[in-house]
Amino acid sequence: MKHKQRWAGAICCFVLFIVVCLFLATHMKGAFRAAGHPEIGLLFFILPGAVASFFSQRREVLKPLFGAMLAAPCSMLIMRLFFSPTRSFWQELAWLLSAVFWCALGALCFLFISSLFKPQHRKNQ
């Protein structure tokens, strides 16, 4: 059980990254383009990183990053196979790599916020 808990952050990030990617590929395509800000959808990738960092064993950043890096090629394959590509391969690759960045940033933000609320144990000298 302990071995599975070590990889809970990576698995959680892998699944949530693909879910967010599919959600943005299906539902949000027209909304952000009509507003003139297609990159706003990338901010949704902060959520998988933060949630995965919460489920990581010691509130790590590397396990969510690893899960996002594994999910990016799977997401690219799913988007290429099941959706008609509207952008070139290189544009979608750049979009997915920036999504990995935002996912890691979400894990870092959660780590920062949780360190602010963690009680400090200081020795009085």
From Swiss-Prot:
Record carries keyword Cell inner membrane: yes
Chief subcellular location equals membrane
Give ranges for the Periplasmic compartment.
28-34, 86-92
Q: Which residue windows are coiled coil?
A: none
Which residues lie toward the Cytoplasmic compartment? 1-6, 56-64, 114-125
Would you say which domain of life the source belongs to?
Bacteria
Mind telling me which residue stretches traverse the membrane in this protein? 7-27, 35-55, 65-85, 93-113
Protein name stated in the entry: Inner membrane protein YbjM
Say which species the protein is native to. Escherichia coli (strain K12)
